[in-house]
Amino acid sequence: MAKKVTGYLKLQVPAGAANPSPPIGPALGQRGLNIMEFCKAFNAQTQKEEKNTPIPVVITIYADRSFTFELKTPPMSFFLKQAAKIQSGSKLPGRDSAGKVTTAQVREIAEKKMKDLNCDSIDSAMRMVEGSARSMGLQVEG
């Protein structure tokens, strides 16, 4: 018989940097989960990633206080900022340009994010990435 799911918890944790301090410790502790068990397992699974890459994680919490977690790909804004070599997006997107990304970079980001997007084709994934780029004040060239 399958375990009874009591809830889900979504966090965004830097790769290889999960520790019991806030925000992870309190979020897991108030649900009665073993904080160190999560931190060790998360850090082990993300050790291949570049340090401080934000990794979204969805934790499934069961009635017996056990849990499983699923790692997602880093946010699209993280990839776009890396591609454009900027620290943050434009404060006035549409008026001020924060930088530029090429169509090749957009395709590469779409291929990385494809498994987390709700689309079937690479073209529709590219349109999603282009929309995110525009909302950050980035120009798409090519």
Curated annotation (Swiss-Prot):
The protein's name: Large ribosomal subunit protein uL11
Annotated coiled-coil segments of the chain: none
This protein's record includes keyword Ribonucleoprotein: yes
Molecular function as annotated in GO: large ribosomal subunit rRNA binding; structural constituent of ribosome
InterPro entries cross-referenced by the UniProt entry: Ribosomal_uL11, Ribosomal_uL11_bac-typ, Ribosomal_uL11_C, Ribosomal_uL11_C_sf, Ribosomal_uL11_CS, Ribosomal_uL11_N, Ribosomal_uL11_N_sf
Modifications after synthesis and translation: One or more lysine residues are methylated.
Family stated for the protein in its record: Belongs to the universal ribosomal protein uL11 family.
Biological-process GO terms, alphabetical: translation
Gene Ontology CC terms, in alphabetical order: cytosolic large ribosomal subunit
Function: Forms part of the ribosomal stalk which helps the ribosome interact with GTP-bound translation factors.
Xref: Pfam families: Ribosomal_L11, Ribosomal_L11_N
PROSITE patterns, A to Z: RIBOSOMAL_L11
Subunit structure: Part of the ribosomal stalk of the 50S ribosomal subunit. Interacts with L10 and the large rRNA to form the base of the stalk. L10 forms an elongated spine to which L12 dimers bind in a sequential fashion forming a multimeric L10(L12)X complex.
Gene: rplK
Keywords: Methylation, Ribonucleoprotein, Ribosomal protein, RNA-binding, rRNA-binding
Record bears the keyword RNA-binding: yes
Top-level taxon in the UniProt lineage: Bacteria
